[in-house]
């Protein structure tokens, strides 16, 4: 009945179903007297057949200024040419099939054309209404299909109440399936909802909330819907599967739709704790960062992740960000806010329970998060845009008391120093400032003592602690258990002095080598002069100057020796170690060779 272009068709070229009908009583030789335009399609029809069923077309013809209306434009009819063809068939008495896919469009078209029972008994609107009630909305699957078909029929489908009826039916039947599943798998209905637009899906979720469905059932539906809708957005945790699109390119419309989708999903999340896996929340946050959603959306996700941060993995925290030219970076600010919110929550919980957060009373959750943070630092340590201040800012978010051992943090620091070999001594000290050398295990201290990348004071801390432990006679098994002696914590001021001594010794060693070379050059010059008397006097003078220089150096080194006469007195350890025998150290010199 429809053709493309502007050439109307004759009645003898109408569909075969029209020719087969037994209700067609007029001769097909009767010429058509009106052309109905629907978009680019033209329908050659008879006025009297259309007016008999459609009050809208009757009004158009009656109210027209032209005495003989030959063309009618119905481009605004819901459903377009395909649905109008079925409405025309109904006017001609031609049989056609009403299905769950087309019933909403047919009902909207019938209301648009005013093909109601008020105008004519047993009209098209009444037929579609009966089909909706008795067939389409009698099952969950049928109601979802009808609701899906309403997406292209807005706003008339909502104005006519079809959307509301479908949402109510879907919400009620989904709640019933969630509580009393009749099919396997039990969550089959969540898969059915995935075909809906996010706005209709939101309406269904709201309907289920009003009916008191369990939050866990809502969470299951939201997770399934999100995974289906955003499966191609972020394919892995690192963001390498993401194709960045500039807001000005051809994909901007799709990007905008995805942004709205993420923001709508986040607004639907129930507030109950523990409903959503942390990796799901982190995946949503990656999408939100990539799509540049609103600050409210990202803050909501960060808040939810911080509540369950003890269950997060390092991969979950690797949140990619992108520059305007598509370069992939890491969103360190989001991670910092998440960790900070978790620590603040733990602090408030500790104070509420009567604990003292500032004196080292940390929960198991906080200790677990500390290990995750250290592993995260080790993972991002090789990134070139990671500065010392950013590294320390993340490391210092976790209280030092939350780390029973600083081995993981030491590993992260070592990776950072290896990835940034051009740091000077002061910068390396800043990197290591977040670590406590006295909380390293025996193996870590052994590695640190031989690590040339570490600053001198860190190496000295490790060596001094081992010496103190050796003097106190503590067994090696206790060393590996990372038992920190209270006496070792009292020697921090002495360690600072040792660091200064070590640096001065290095300067003296350099000065000594210069003087040796100077004396050697003088001897060569005097031997080449040839005058024995002056040569002898020069040698005597040289010997005296050598003797005087080495004497002064030896005296100065003797003053700087931290172990001379047992200056590092550890006798006070006896008071707290319960009678542990500590032998007095032997006299020894501070070697400068």
UniProtKB/Swiss-Prot annotation:
What Pfam families does the record point to?
Answer: BTB, NPH3
Pathway the protein takes part in:
Protein modification; protein ubiquitination
What InterPro entries does UniProt report for this protein, alphabetically?
Answer: BTB/POZ_dom, NPH3/RPT2-like, NPH3_dom, SKP1/BTB/POZ_sf
* BTB domain boundaries: 32-100
Its biological purpose is as follows: May act as a substrate-specific adapter of an E3 ubiquitin-protein ligase complex (CUL3-RBX1-BTB) which mediates the ubiquitination and subsequent proteasomal degradation of target proteins. Signal transducer of the phototropic response and photo-induced movements. Necessary for root phototropism. Involved in hypocotyl phototropism under high rate but not under low rate light. Regulates stomata opening. Seems to be not involved in chloroplast accumulation and translocation.
Family membership, please give it. Answer: Belongs to the NPH3 family.
Protein name (database record): Root phototropism protein 2
Q: Which species expresses this protein natively?
A: Arabidopsis thaliana (Mouse-ear cress)
């Amino acid at each position: 009945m429809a053709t493309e272009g502007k050439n109307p068709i004759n009645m003898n070229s109408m569909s075969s179903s029209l020719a087969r009908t037994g209700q067609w009583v007029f001769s097909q030789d009767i010429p058509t007297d009106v052309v109905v335009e629907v978009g680019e399609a033209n329908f050659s029809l008879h006025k009297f057949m259309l007016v008999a069923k459609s009050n809208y077309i009757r009004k158009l013809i009656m109210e027209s200024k032209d005495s003989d209306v030959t063309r009618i434009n119905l481009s605004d009819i819901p459903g377009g040419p395909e649905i109008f063809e079925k409405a025309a068939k109904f006017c001609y008495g031609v049989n056609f099939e009403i299905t769950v896919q087309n019933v909403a469009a047919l009902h909207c078209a019938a209301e648009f054309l005013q093909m109601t029972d008020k105008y004519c008994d047993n009209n098209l609107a009444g037929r579609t209404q009966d089909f909706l009630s008795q067939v389409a909305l009698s099952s969950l699957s049928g109601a979802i299909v009808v609701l899906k078909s309403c997406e292209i029929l807005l706003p008339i489908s909502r104005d006519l109440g079809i959307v509301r009826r479908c949402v109510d039916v879907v919400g009620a039947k989904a709640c019933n399936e969630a509580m009393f599943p009749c099919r396997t798998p039990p969550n089959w209905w969540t898969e059915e909802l995935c075909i809906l637009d996010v706005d209709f899906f939101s309406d269904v979720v709201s309907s289920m909330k009003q009916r008191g469905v369990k939050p866990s059932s809502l969470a299951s539906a939201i997770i399934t819907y999100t995974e289906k809708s955003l499966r191609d957005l972020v394919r892995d945790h690192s963001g390498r599967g993401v194709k960045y699109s500039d807001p000005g390119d051809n994909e901007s419309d799709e990007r905008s739709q995805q942004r709205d989708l993420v923001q709508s999903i986040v607004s639907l999340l129930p507030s109950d704790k523990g409903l959503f896996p942390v990796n799901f929340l982190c995946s949503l946050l990656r999408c939100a960062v990539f799509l540049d959603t609103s600050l409210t959306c990202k803050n909501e996700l960060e808040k939810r992740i911080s509540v369950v941060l003890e269950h997060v993995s390092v991969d979950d925290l690797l949140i990619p960000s992108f520059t305007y030219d598509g370069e992939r970076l890491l969103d360190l600010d989001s991670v910092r806010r998440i960790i900070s919110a978790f620590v603040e929550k733990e602090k408030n919980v500790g104070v509420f329970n009567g604990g003292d957060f500032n004196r080292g009373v940390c929960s198991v959750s906080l200790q677990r998060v500390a290990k995750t943070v250290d592993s995260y630092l080790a993972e991002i340590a090789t990134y070139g845009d990671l500065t010392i201040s950013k590294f320390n800012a993340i490391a210092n978010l976790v209280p030092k008391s939350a780390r029973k051992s600083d081995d993981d943090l030491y590993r992260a620091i070592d990776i950072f120093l290896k990835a940034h070999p051009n740091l000077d001594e002061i910068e390396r000290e800043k990197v290591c400032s977040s670590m406590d050398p006295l909380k390293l295990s025996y193996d870590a201290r052994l590695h640190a003592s031989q690590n040339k990348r570490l600053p001198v004071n860190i190496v000295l801390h490790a060596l001094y602690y081992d010496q103190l432990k050796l003097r106190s006679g503590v067994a090696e098994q206790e060393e590996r258990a990372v038992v920190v002696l209270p006496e070792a914590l009292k020697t921090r001021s002495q360690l600072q002095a040792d660091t200064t001594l070590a640096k001065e010794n290095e300067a003296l060693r350099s000065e000594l080598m210069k003087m040796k070379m100077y004396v050697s050059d003088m001897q060569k010059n005097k031997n080449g002069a040839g005058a024995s008397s002056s040569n002898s006097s020069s040698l005597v003078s040289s010997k005296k100057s050598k003797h005087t220089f080495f004497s002064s150096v030896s005296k100065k080194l003797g003053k700087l020796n931290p172990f001379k006469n047992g200056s590092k007195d550890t006798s006070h350890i006896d008071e707290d170690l319960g009678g542990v025998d500590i032998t007095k150290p032997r006299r020894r010199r501070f070697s400068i060779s």
